[in-house]
Regions:
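An edge-strand/N-cap motif at the start of beta-rich repeat modules
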Residues: 1-17
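Loop/turn residues immediately N-terminal
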Residues: 7-11, 44-47, 82-85
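Blade-level signature of beta-propeller repeat domains, shared across WD40, Kelch, NHL, RCC1
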Residues: 82-99
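Short loop/turn segments that connect beta-strands within beta-propeller blades
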Residues: 15-16, 51-53, 89-91
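Repeated scaffold domains used in trafficking and secretory/extracellular systems
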Residues: 24-37, 62-74
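Residue-level marker for isolated small/hydroxyl-bearing positions within beta-strands
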Residues: 4-5, 41, 79
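A short beta-strand motif characteristic of beta-propeller blades
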Residues: 18-26, 55-61, 93-98
Length: 99
């Protein structure tokens, strides 16, 4: 599977390359797929986590996200525009902050 962002919309594609799910927000800047979760960074700096069925898992309370990456199987690193990195779990709870 892979996540493809085009014109602010994200499609999760299956193994054959056919679209499986289209995520609802229309202003997506970046999408990262890891196992059964997709983390998206919106153009306004917010970050959301979806499962591969397209259901919203959580919205993170940051408004200046530059990009995200997965840490292990159950945590998400949110990189801010000012260089700070926050590690959150999939429930939205802040685990650790790095400067």
């Amino acid at each position: 599977m892979n996540a493809v962002v085009r014109n602010g919309c994200c499609e999760i594609r299956g193994g054959a390359g056919k679209p499986r799910v289209t995520l609802p927000p229309m202003n997506i800047d970046e999408a990262i797929l890891h196992r059964d979760h997709v983390a998206v960074v919106l153009r306004n700096g917010y970050c959301q986590l979806y499962n591969t069925e397209g259901k919203l898992v959580t919205t993170y309370s940051v408004n200046d996200a530059k990009f995200v990456r997965f840490v292990g199987d159950d945590q998400l690193a949110i990189h801010h525009r000012n260089g700070r990195v926050e590690i959150h779990d999939f429930t939205g709870r802040l685990v650790r902050v790095s400067a």
